[in-house]
Amino acid sequence: MNKTAAEAIALANEVAQLVKAEVSADVQVIMAPPSLFIYEVNKAVSGISNLAVSAQNCHEKSSGAYTGEISANMLASSGISYVILGHSERRQYFAESNTQLAAKVDAALAAGLTPIFCCGESLDLREGGEFLAYVAQQLTESLFHLSAEDFAKVVIAYEPIWAIGTGLTASSDQAQEMHAYLRGHLATKYGQNAADNCSILYGGSCNAKNAQELFACADVDGGLIGGASLVAADFITIATSF
């Protein structure tokens, strides 16, 4: 939860100008404001082919008596293209399960949105040597019911929870190891070609200082940016790090 309405629109306008001036046309930039500001932010960035807007979450039902919730259909009707699902904070604070996230993925796809599906492990799981199986299970239980056609519409974001706000940092070697493993696991279900074509983003405290090294990894296709996205100049530095 960051930015007031005025601050969010100002940030969107600044990012839009910087994307037009500095970011290569083949680099896709996505902003994910709070749902309250999506419509205005989307208007602010409209007309820029490589700048899009995402929601941070959606409900798994298309409509109904779920006070305070927002459906994928409602998000799509606002003109956006993406929705983040399964973010580590949603899993931690709202107890979102793999089963629930499978339903959210289905809802997003049915509404024509591209899901950015997040997965990742805690420090305990990493230190216990259970992290590979844990993250594989997240993918299997939330995505492997999809047809090959629908899977091709999904973006994956790996979040090493142990490297977010802990003072610890994942090395580029650790990031590459996990991304290669995730791609290999996806290939067991959908084949190597489909896995190779899947965008896998890195979301563990990626910032202006480490983005270039991380993005140089063979299996890191981009970043899911947190705090660094709140400052336009830092965000654009990351976007120009490819």
Feature annotation, model-predicted:
Residues 1-157, 161-242:
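Active-site loop-to-helix "anion-binding N-cap" substructures in soluble metabolic enzymes
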